[in-house]
Amino acid sequence: MFSRTDLEAREAATLCPYATLSRDTRGREYPEAESATRTAFQKDRDRVLHTTAFRRLEAKTQVFLNVSYSGHADHYRTRLTHTLEVQQVARSVALNLGLNETLAETIALTHDLGHPPFGHAGERVLNALMHDHGGFNHNTQARRIVTHLESRYPDFPGLNLTLDTLDGLNKHDRAGIGHASLEAQLVDAADALAYTAHDLDDGLRSGLITPAQLQELPLWRELLARVPGTPAPLTSRERRILHRELLGWLIRDLTQASAQAIAQSGVQTAAEARAYPERLMTYSGAMRDLLRSAGTFLREHLYRHWRVEMQVEQAERVLTTLFRAYTARPSLLPPAASARAEHSGLPRAVCDHIAGMTDRYALETHAAITPPGAPTSWPH
């Protein structure tokens, strides 16, 4: 059986000198005994996996409402499947670059915990509703979840994750990215990779994006050139082949460009990598241009598609009604949320409660507090 010190020694012997080592962790906010058989980052990862917030990601929107499209929503990606895909990419690239795989996957598993129901539409609604109370941001909410809202241990609030993991969440918000660990930078890059590839795939699967529209996209045209003989119209088999090729292409570019950037930077330690003024986990210049145009394409043809915009309208109606109902009648809140209101104030407690809901639970709660014949609006 390997002890924690054995695992730490293995890291030191096999990882590159600029990787973040578990034995060099900056510790936790609340001192506690470390595991005898797990590294500090393995312990972080396991704590995140067992949270309620992580389980709820299964029923939260990525792009398509989790309960929409006549039952076909089961085939589209959710926040959970997106998170697992980011984890896989981050771990794979970390392995190839000699970075700390466990820290990278822990940050990846944690980075989307703060998303509310209804995806980015829900985030915009909550941010507007909380305008006078500090706003709402899913990255900030993820940190709030792991430091305060998940109550699983008697000796401290939250999960008491290492400061290294928590800093990875800060850096996912892009503030001061030059001072992030390479593992945190990697998760940020893997997130962009995953949602670009997978949103294109889901857009095609749903029919909201057509192959004809994709001909406008430089990324797609170059992808087709890499898979000669692709038929038109696309079959489901060919779509899967193209998706697999796109993922592999993006991962190879990220790995190779990052390795080159690290070598050219001359960094020799994790501290030097954090202090380096430029992002070292990066894509080639050509790929950055392709991804930038892909983001513009997705905004125009998928995220602003009228069927997706209908979800935005639904999110606004449901979340606004819930927020006003809870703030007008705090007795509607469950006991745990009511208790938080004493410390963080009613608006923030209401926001925390709503942000933790799944799509389905938000819809069911909305229906319960606005039954047929009841008033459809609550006091502002």
Swiss-Prot record:
The keyword Membrane does not apply. Residues 79-196 form the HD domain. One of its GO terms (biological process) is dGTP catabolic process. Keywords: Hydrolase. It holds the Pfam family HD. CDD domains: HDc. GO terms for molecular function: dGTPase activity. Belongs to the dGTPase family. Type 2 subfamily. PANTHER family: DEOXYGUANOSINETRIPHOSPHATE TRIPHOSPHOHYDROLASE-LIKE PROTEIN (PTHR11373:SF43), DEOXYNUCLEOSIDE TRIPHOSPHATE TRIPHOSPHOHYDROLASE (PTHR11373). This is Deoxyguanosinetriphosphate triphosphohydrolase-like protein. It comes from Deinococcus deserti (strain DSM 17065 / CIP 109153 / LMG 22923 / VCD115).
